[in-house]
Regions:
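HIT superfamily nucleotide-processing domains
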Residues: 1-310
Length: 310
């Protein structure tokens, strides 16, 4: 965490503080964390459920503030656990979007068998079915009833809604489901950039702009995400789980959960060194937890005024 003297705070509430990232990957990137310094080694998924929910509601408020003040149409969320600093959420304004939703895809694929020291939403080459089934079985083995049949209830107004996620919920598409409850379904993506990359969706079509969901729908989705994160850690032996809200591959609310694994040696120093800092003035079709180049004090002050000046 940056020192208090150098933080450009844009929002504070209930023990949380949000401030401009001094090394933004995109303009106006914000870090949300506890107001007081916590112990190093933090993940939002290791918070108590009630505290986790308060963090996620805080992120929703910050996203609305950024949309209003920066004139962006939506924000993304990225949270990667850290072994050397407290838990954080990053709220990223997505610049350059059209008024109407259309798919945006990253220009390149990326796969990391072990934690590369960041989380990204980039896709990777398709896994074969047997490898996906092997991962699915590892995860489901930690369920109370691993062999229970899937619940194929679909809650959309149109019972034949044609979207991919709707068809997955109804069991009409090949899938590697790892968890479900009355309101949500979690399944492996066949294009994972990390083993066990999981997508969580509600049982009815909702906007892919998660921060604009009704409060009840938002709370339901983020609490289901917390539950699935616990399952993935236990089932796969991941040291942590990353989280991304983005919504530009499919226009249907979904959370992305990314298991992170240490190299076989278990030596943290073996983790891949992140690439050189990148800065994206407009949304490039993916988001990442990577830091960008250091922002100038003048730029941070200008951004701070734009967000906080009423």
């Amino acid at each position: 965490m940056s020192s208090t003297l150098h933080r450009h705070i844009i929002w504070e509430s209930d023990g949380l503080v949000a401030y401009l990232h001094p090394r933004p990957w995109t303009p106006g990137s914000v870090i949300l964390e506890r107001s007081t310094s916590g112990s190093p080694g933090g993940s939002i998924f290791h918070l108590q459920e009630s505290e986790y929910l308060s963090w996620m509601l805080g992120a929703r408020t910050v996203a609305k503030l950024l949309c209003d003040r920066l004139g962006v149409r939506r924000c993304a969320l990225v949270s990667r656990p850290h072994r050397d600093r407290p838990a954080q959420i990053r709220v990223l304004p997505l610049h350059g979007l059209d008024a109407e939703w259309r798919p945006h895809l990253a220009g390149e694929e990326e796969y990391n068998a072990h934690d590369p020291a960041y989380c990204t939403s980039k896709s990777a080459p398709r896994w074969n079915d047997s490898s996906l089934t092997e991962i699915q079985n590892k995860i489901r083995a930690k369920l109370p009833s691993p062999d229970a049949p899937p619940n194929l209830t679909f809650l959309g107004v149109d019972p034949t809604h044609p979207g991919l996620f709707s068809r997955i919920v109804r069991g009409e598409e090949q899938q590697w489901r790892v968890w479900d409850d009355e309101g949500h379904v979690a399944f492996l993506t066949p294009f994972p950039n990390s083993p066990g990359f999981t997508v969580l969706v509600p049982r009815r079509p909702l906007t892919s702009d998660i921060f604009k969901l009704d409060k009840e729908d938002y709370e339901g989705l983020v609490l289901a995400t917390w539950k699935v994160s616990q399952l993935l850690e236990k089932g796969l032996g991941a040291w942590g789980i990353g989280l991304i809200f983005e919504g530009f591959e499919i226009d249907y609310a979904h959370a992305k959960l990314i298991p992170l694994f240490l190299p076989p040696s278990g030596v943290e120093g073996d983790i891949t060194t992140p690439p050189s800092p990148q800065f994206c003035a407009t949304y490039p079709g993916y988001v990442t937890s990577e830091d960008g180049p250091e922002a100038s004090l003048e730029n941070l002050k200008e951004m701070h005024i734009k967000i906080t000046l009423i």
